[in-house]
Every structure is written in structure tokens, then in C-alpha cells.
């Protein structure tokens, strides 16, 4: 805790009466709370004031936080104080008597810095200069310092008192202690027994004090002072140890000899009164006199001791001088005797030298002559050796591989023979490596849990034509990854989008728009990218991607590639994608380089392409993924990993080499020492022998001893030769300069001997460290090998993700590869850029050295030969004929080696002098272990098929349409897709028919279905009908073609879905048949769409378009469908239609209104009033059988209409409407997905699972990944209303079985089993779903007979008179419509109201209580008679308002327009009104007359028409709702003026939709 004004700071405690809910002021710095702001403010100011000090260091002038930080750092610094020094330092502190802390610190630091204590960790400097961390086991005192020097004084000597006249108290104290200090042992004389901290080192060793040191900053004055501050305090003016520290470390019981073998030091005492330079306050005058007398006596005592020591020293000096003089005289006498003896010997030696001088000169001349002869012979040998070395140097120089004269034949590799064409095999390997390297980044394991292999996946994908095979999975993986990554990048661009000005400046800086070609390409790509939005209602990424639509989505993606390159994301592309532009897109490059392939995709399935064409597509998709930001970041991360792994591997190798060098040097040193010892022993023996011979023969043979000595001296030459044998590396240097090097060699021998003797002790020290057991060495070696292997694996995996490059090239320029994904050593024979002369052996320029330029030819690099392959070479006799080299015309191929024996042969045959082969050989030797490990798992059968299986497999991969149709593998993909499309068309038609969502407008449905099922497509084009308008298909197609001749060309974008058959193929039958099949199947889908009632279609094909375009998405969808040129395009339109159908309205999903359960369709009847399902056993009273004719539920029964509460009894219509809508089933409401997930609904297990999956679709955003590509079949294809399903994977089983739709139970079974039966007709049980529940009434008129023929099967099944016989749903003709009632039918002319009737018929929705003359005639009669009997008009107003609010087209009129959303609305509309206002007036009985109510309604419509243009969705909804209002008003007997009925407001053409 910091000190406040150098006093402890105490926090303020919280008040005792503090309430839990009381508001207080909290000070975060001191963790205190205050009730009053003034206290809080005062404490805050105090914390920020410089009045605090650190409690540890005592540093003043700090703020509270600074003091806390100072304490933290000081305590952290104290943690590093050596623990073995704590007790010794405290013990020494206890011996001091100082009044200042820094004086104690100086005394202790001066004593401790040169002494080291037991258990202390120090650094020992070894003999070789390295530092070793050791622990002190024992402190050894010097042996010669025992006794008096070690402080063991006798009591008599220690108590001698000498009187001194000094009156200085400090001199007294220092002199007294000096008597002991002079005898203190020098700290450098101590020795220490240390033990290394590493266990593998030796146990212990004794070192000198000069070899020991503490680590830097481990023990310093500052740290010691900080430590003493924590454990010391001032007591009576003297610094003493705190009582807590004294007792905690047991200082009183400690013995200093345990820490250091010397007597404890005696420190200088400093008087306490000198602390501040002022006399102490507590000492009296009497005490001062006593202290002064004691100090005087002590000074006298010290002076006497000093005088005594001085006299003793003088006596000792006199004795020593006398002894030295005596020894000097004895030495002089001995020297004189030796001198005389030496002079006698010199005289005798002079005489002997004169006698042998002549013989010595003769021998010397003979020796010189022999020496000259030997020197000549050596010079001759040296010259020959130099020439040979020059020859070897020239011969071993690197050269062109084909110029080497010792080339060996390379082992013949096995050619690769697989189902793939040879030219595709290399690209297949590239795709395989890409998938293995980047599969983790793009979640490859989701599509291929077992991984991607060459034989099982890639070969089958490229050769086979199965639409559900590996090619589908691969393309789905690529497109999914691309779409996902592009969506993520779009989000990042949106976040980082810059201003328009900056974007413009950046675009101009990058100069992207300067190239008109790029601009044109980007414009075309943008046009192609907009096509799916215009014709399918969603973007390309949102289309349903499955095996059937894959070809078309792939083609659209290729065409739209480059559309994302805009000026808005220029900065992002420049910063994150390396300046990516449209021409960098691999798919755009494919589109530009292979336009025929893109055109072929428009009419052919991708599964029927050739392997080469498939590989081009896969190659382009790989290139597309490589340009993404995520891939670039992934590669950069692995580049960093590779760099780090290589650095670690280099360090590991350097460490291994260092250890090996040290071990080798130690062995060499030991051998040299042994040889040196032997030589010294021999020299000693020779010297002794020579001395004996000299003494024996000196008198008989004069000069013999001298001659032998000379011979001995010349033996240094032999010694020189021996030394040369020890150091063979310097032989040539000695031979080059024999005179000088010989003398220096002699000197070096002596120096080496001296150095070896000096280092012998160091070697012995090193040998002590070496003893490692064999098991430990083996374990260490295995650990290093394991670490090296892990680093190599890490490097290889990083290389696979960054840059795979060949091992090298041989003499024939063949590349050698090893791949991480497949085992084996592969050879690529690529002859591009080579000429024939480059593959032929050429004479080496080394053999004919006549021309100086030949060596230059022999050492040309590989690049120089490639660059000069077209130039002429000077080759002796061929110089006169200058011929251009011929390029090599050979197909590229791949080969492989399959065994380690072949690898050994290859390494042996490679030439070490060639440029390419030397590098290849070195690489193969380095990678030999890894290659052999791969070859051990290599299967030769996968890469080399026999000829017979290869021939048998060719027909499988061909696109024969006449092959057996029974076997799917023998079918072409086009045929497979055709059969599947027929199944799906029949299935969706059956689901629409069974679900009462509509019916195809043909004479006989069964004939139509059998024609489609049996492939008799010519029977499909009998006639087509759209919502009652009979129109032949030929007329329809002709109209479409005449209307859109230019539109199709513009929309198809360079060949999108062209109808013209391909003229490339010479066979006219196959393309024609395919075109006809596509045309008829598209026509069948068109007929199915025409048969769906408009009210059961939702976005994007709901026909509502809020924009200003006169064509809706549905219109463009129809145009695109009829101009489809491939089956995949038809599949794409089918998925869009399936996504747009309101399957929740299907009767197959009907739910009982009472028990809220699905199923048991045989016992379910539909109410003719509300179209709600009711089980016969749930109705009260129960129904014994399905009733004939009309049946109404209890709520819709006419007699119960009067029981409804009047408007006066209900506070608001809103609550009633909400209550009724809450009771309605989720099949009637589009936005009631929350009800589907309620746990209180007890449904069948399969149905509940489907409901849960549908809820997930509605609540969660669509995901791009999918578990499978196949199209499973399910009868209930519901979609979430808010989040429509994008793809097949989110709606498993979109296309149900036609044979399993009799009951909802069967549909559940079919959905769970995912089965599809393609050849069975629908059973008759499906007809009984609604049979008997209602009766069908027909008019005898001729016109009605036509509709009976066309629509009677559907009206019987569905029983919807409102859909078939009401004026809203009757078929339309030129100027008439059929108005059918129970009593009469009449033809009403439609001049201006024809469009209103059509729009109204499309706007009807299920689940609404519709009042028509046919379905509920009784209420109509009661209403008409009620008005005649005086019934109040408010009941009619109330009923009409409810009908208007519940109408689907009432959404623009429910509430007033918000002024915030539409600011200018109230500037144009002066009298705004809405249905909620009208409803409030009805509830408050504000309408006195019917005309007021009708005027408000008409004012609402006139406001809509005045503000919104005619073609907007709001105006269309107003038109339909106004027509509905007029009809209902007439039915209720309300009078609407003709002028109001005929009133049609002309909206402003320039206004846009505001609501």
C-alpha cells in the first residue's frame, strides 16, 4: 500500500448503514465508496497529487497509481534476488552497526561481491573459455593459510593492549579492526567445489575463485539496498534487522562457517549521532563524558599494540638479512668452482674440433650433392602432378550434359497408361495436387470424406459420363467454394468501400478503364451476370445448384466471370488481390480462348464433354480459386511456415555438425597426443643412447659424437615428413616452396608440441564431460532424427501449398517429379522448345584444346543452350553448312519408376559433370529415403493398364446414344437427364394436381402423362391453355418467337440458350433429336406452369412486379423456357417454378382445424366456405361418411352467421381479426411458421420432422454447402415463406413420387425413403381424396360443355366452385365472361373490366371466408330480404370492411402512409384515408348514410390511383380490391353510383411507387 505523507494509508471503510439500493460514488483507484460527492472529489484529487511515496523503495513525489506501479516493479525486482544469499546477507547485516542504510549496503556489497556462498548458482569459466552454469557445493579454504593466517589467534595475542595518543574515534575503531583485517584471507585464494546444473555433465569439480562469476544484474547495489529496506529498520539511531525477519530466518541460530569457511567479518561501527550532523537529542552530558573517556582509553590501547608490532617486525627483518648474506657467499663460491671446470672442458673441446674439421667438411659436401639430386627428382614429380591435377580440374568442370564423354545409359521408365489421354494426365495431377493442398481451406472433406484419388475420382470424373458421378461432386465443390468466397469478398468490399472521388482517382491511377477491350469484356460479363436476376428472379449464386442444373449454372458462371471487376472494388482488388482485373480471371480466359467449348455447353451437358474439355473447365476453376483473397492469404501463411521450418532445420543441422566437429576434433587431438608422446619417448631414448656412445667412443674416435649429433639434427627432416603424413592437406604447399616451409615446419613442430601440452589439461577436462552411455547417445540420436523428420514433413507440406517444383531434369530435358498426393517417381517428357540436335550427344571441347573457345562451349549452362538452340554452332567440319535446327515432333508423355532398384540404377547412371544431371543426382540423393518410402506404397497397376482393359474401357467413355438404355453406366448423360426430367415433370404435375393447386389444360390428363412418360413428345403439343384461355401451343410459340426475336438474341448473351441446332456435327439426327426433346420437355413444363392457379404462385414468379418494366419475371421466365437449348436449362427453370409454388397451400398439407393434425385424408372433408380441413370423427356431431354435395363447417354454416357479435359488442375489429387468424391453420397463412414448430401439436413423426426442417429453413439463412447432389423425392415440398429455399439440399425430396401420393401417410413414407418409381401410373385412390365431399353442377349450355370437357376431372376432385364457376374464375374470351349462378348464367360484356376480372381471379387466396352466390346462397337471400325488412346498414358496413381487410390486395390500404417513408405523399394527397380509419368510423357509428361509407372507400381508391402509376403493384392491388368491393357491395345491396364504378383515375406516369 502506498504511503501518504510517508505514513501508511488507510482506506475508508463502507458505512455500516449502507443500503443495497443506495447510490454512492465509487473511486476505482482506491476501491472506496463515498456517499458525498465532495469526499469523492477530495479523494480523487488526493490520488492525483504528488504526495504519495512507494512503500518498498521509499521514492517520494508520486501519485497513487505511480506509487502502486513502483511497488509492483520493486517487488518484481525483489523476486529475482538470489535465495542462497538471503540468510548470509541478513547474517552480515546483523554484524554491522551503521546509522545509514547505504553504508551497510556498501559494507556488505564490498564483502559479498568477491565471495560466493554454498548453494549459490554461479557461472564457471571453463578452460576453453565457455561459461557453464553450476551450483556451489562447498567452499574450500587455501591449505597454506591455516593457522595464524586463518584467524586462529592465541588469546594472549588477541588481548594485547597498546596505548595510543590518537583522539579520533574512527581511527581507534579502524585500527582495532585492522589488526584482524590484515590477517584476513584473500577471497581469490579460496577454491570452490561446484556441480553443473545439467545432469549429463560431470558430477562435481573444484575451480578457482577467478573462474567464478555471478550473472549480470543478479546481485547489485540497488537490488541489495532494496532487499535491505524490506528487512531492516532503525532502532535507537542504528539500522537493525526487523524482528520478523530475524525470527523468520533464524539468524541467531545460524553459523557463518556453513556459508563460508572464514571468520565472520568485523565491520566499522559508525556512531549514531552522525546521522543528521546534529547531536542526538536523548544523550545527556554525563553520558557524553563517559563515552569520551572510553574512546580515549581505546586509542591508547591501539597505539600500544601498533608499537609492539613494529618492534617485532624490525627484529624479523634483521634475522632475514643475515641469512640472505650467508647464502649469497655460498653461491659465489660454487659459481667460481664451476667456471674453472668449464674452462678446462672448453680447451679439450677446441682440440677435438680442430681434429675432425676436415672430415666434417667432406661429409657436408657429399650431403649437399645428394640433396640437390633429390630436389631435382621432387621437382619433376611435382610438375607431373600439376599437369595431372590440371587435367582433372578441366575434366571435372560442369558442362552440357550431352557433351560428357562418360554418359551411362539411363534405366528405361515405364510409360503411364490409364483411362485418361496422355495429354490430360499432367493437368489431372495438377488438379489433384490443388485439391490436396487447398482442400482444407475450402472444406473438401464435406464433399469427399474419403479424399480425392486419381483413379477412383479424377479418372472417373474425366472419362465417365454419370450425372451423379465424381465430376458432379467436383464441379459442385468448385462452384460452391467460388460462390462462398465471392460472397465473403463482396461483404468485405461493402465494409471498406471508399468515396466516389477516391474510387475514381484510384481507377484512373490504375488505368483500368483505359483499355476498351477490358471495358467491353466487363460489360458483357455484367450483362451475363444480370440474366439470372431477370429471368429467374435471383442472382447466380442463389440458383438451386444440383446435378441437373450444374451444367447451366457452370456456363452462366463462365460467361459472368469478370463482372465483379468494378470501380467500386478497385481499391480492394489492388490491395488484397494484387491488382486483379477482368483479364486475370481464369474463367474469362477460358471463355476467350475456347469459345467453342462455352457454346457447346449451351446445348450439351458437361458430363458428355470430352476429357480434355472437362479438364479445361477444372483447370479454369482451379485458377479462379487461386485468385481469391482467402487463397492468397493461405499461401502467404504457408510461405511463412516454410521459411520458419527451413530456418529451424538449418539450425538443427548446424547444431549436429557442430557436435560432430567437436567429437572429431577431440578424437584427432587424442591421436596427436599419443603420437607426440611416442615421439618424445623415442627422442629421449636416442639422446640417452647418443650420450653413452659419445662417452664410450670420445677418446678412440675423435669427432664421432659430433657427427652423430649432426645426424640427429638432420632427423628433423624425417620428423617433418611424419608431420606431413599427419596433415596431408598441406603437402602441395610444402612442395611448392620447400626451403622456407621446411624451416617453418620445424618451428611449428615445436610450437605444436608446446600447444598440445598446454591443452592437455583442457582435453582431460573435456574427456570428463563426455562419458555418455550408449543408450543415452542412441536416445539422443533418435530424438534428433525424429525432430529432423518432423521438420522435413512440415517443409514438404508447406511446399505442397506454396510451390511444387520438379526435382530436376536429365540429359534429355525430362522433368522428374514426386507428388505429396500420390506415391512414385514420375518423369515428364515435354519436348516443347527443344530441337533434335539438343537431344543428340555432341563431341566435348575438352579433348581438342586447339581452339580457345572450346572450353566455353563445354561449360555453357542449360539456359544458354535453350536460348541459342536456333543458332548455328561451330562443330569442326560442319561449319560450312549452316542449318536451322529442327524442332522435336513427339507427343508429350508421362513415365514412372516403380522400385528402389530402378532409383539406384538411375542415381548411378546420372552424370555428376552435367549441368542438369548433377543437380538432379544431388537432389535424388537427398530425397532418396522419402522417395523409397513412397515407392514402397506404389501400385504399378493403377498407372499402367494392359492393352486389353484399355480397349474395353473406351466404349464406356464414348457418348454413344444407341448403347443399351437399360444400364445407366452405358447411357449418355443427356439420356439420363432426359429420363430424370420426365420423372420430375410428372412428379411436380402430380403434386400440383393432388394438392389442388391447379391442373394442366389438356383434354385428357392421363393421355398427356402417358405421352410424357413413354417419350411420345409429339402428343404433348396438342393444345395449351392459360387460366381458361384456350391457345394452341404452336400459336403460343409463334407469338413468342415473333415477339422476342431480338430479345432472345440480346438476353442470351453470346449464345446463352440459343435455339438454333448445332451445325458442327455432321450427324443431323442426334442434334435434331436432342433439340426436339429439349423443346418438347420445355413445352411440357410450360403447360404445367400454365395450369397452376396464379394465387398459388409466389415470388419470383408471382406476377407482381413493383418496377416500371412492362415484363414481369414470369414473362421473362416463360420466354427463356421456350428458348431453352439444353436439358440443364429446363431443369433450372423447373427449380425456379418449384421454388415459386406455394406448396403450403396444397391439400396434401391440409390440417384438421379441430385436432390440428395432418394425415387420414380418407376421412377429411373440406369446408365449402373457408376451405379448411375437418376430420369426420372430429366434427360434432360426428359424420359417419363423407357427405355428398356442399358441406359447411359449424363456423361457416349459414344459420350461424347471426350468432356473431355485432360491431357494437366488439371493441375493435382488429382484435376479432387477430383472434380468428390466430385460430387459422398454418396452411392458410404464409407467415405462420412459428405455429408449425409448436410442441403442443401432436403430428406424425415424419410430418413433424418435415415441419421442423421447414422451420429451420425459414429461420436460418440459406447455406451454400450441401450433403449430396442427388435429387431425392418427397411429396411435400414446402418452403419457408420468409426465406425461400435456394437449393435442392435444403428441401430434400423436392420432386415426389407419382405412385405414392394417395394419402399423406404414403407421402411421409416416400419422403423418408427417398424413392422414385418412374413407370407406374397414379392409382385410383388419389381420385377419392375429395370425391363425395362436394357435388359438381354443370350448365347445359354449349359453352359450359367445353369447360366440362376440359375441367370436370379437376372440379370433381377439388370441388371448388369458386375457382371454376364463379365470374372471378371463369374462362375469359374476347369481350365476354361467363357469370354462373345457381339460378341463372349470363354473358356480361367486358369492355373495361376484363383486366379487372383476370387480376381478381389471380388475387384470390385460400383460407379466406369468401361470399359468393354459388357457395353460400342463403346468406345472400337473407341479406337482400333483411334490407327490405329494415335491417341496420352498419352490419353490412362491418361485414364489408372485414372482407376488405382480409383481402390479399388490401396491404397498401391498411394504414395511413408514413410521412417519413414517403415525404411528398401529403403534398399530392390532400385527404388521406385508410381502412383502419374507416373501420374506426364503423365501430363508432359515425356513418349515418351508406353514401358516406361508399364515398370514403372510393376516396381511398382515388388517392391510390392519383399517387401511384398504373403499372405499379400498389395500383394493380387497388384495381383488384376496387373490383372486389364493387362486387361485394352489389351482393350486400349497397348502392354504388355508375360514375363511381366507371371511374378510373389516370395516374401520373412520372411518379414511382411510394407505398
Swiss-Prot record:
Which parts of the sequence are PHD-type zinc fingers? 1149-1199
Q: Which GO terms describe its biological process?
A: chromatin remodeling; nucleosome assembly; positive regulation of DNA replication; regulation of DNA replication
UniProt region (Required for interaction with SMARCA5 and formation of the CHRAC ISWI chromatin remodeling complex), positions on chain: 668-935
Answer whether the UniProt record assigns the keyword Zinc-finger to this protein: yes
Q: Where is the composition biased (Polar residues)?
A: 1297-1313, 1369-1386
Q: Where is the region Required for interaction with NCOR1?
A: 1-133
Q: Per the record, where are the segments of Acidic residues compositional bias?
A: 705-714, 728-737, 1214-1258
ATP-binding is among the record's keywords:
no
Bias (Basic residues) ranges: 1263-1277
- Mind telling me which GO cellular component terms the entry cites? ACF complex; CHRAC; nuclear chromosome; nucleus; pericentric heterochromatin
Q: Which UniProt keywords apply?
A: Bromodomain, Coiled coil, Isopeptide bond, Metal-binding, Nucleus, Phosphoprotein, Transcription, Transcription regulation, Ubl conjugation, Zinc, Zinc-finger
Region named Interaction with SMARCA5: 668-935
Bromo domain span: 1429-1532
Region (Required for interaction with the CHRAC1-POLE3 heterodimer. Required for interaction with the CHRAC1-POLE3 heterodimer) spans which residues? Answer: 1-128
Oligomeric and partner information:
Component of the ACF-1 ISWI chromatin remodeling complex at least composed of SMARCA1 and BAZ1A, which regulates the spacing of histone octamers on the DNA template to facilitate access to DNA. Within the ACF-1 ISWI chromatin remodeling complex interacts with SMARCA1; the interaction is direct. Component of the ACF-5 ISWI chromatin remodeling complex (also called the ACF complex) at least composed of BAZ1A and SMARCA5/SNF2H, which regulates the spacing of histone octamers on the DNA template to facilitate access to DNA.
Listed name of the protein? Bromodomain adjacent to zinc finger domain protein 1A
For this protein's source organism, the top of the classification is:
Eukaryota, Metazoa, Chordata, Craniata, Vertebrata
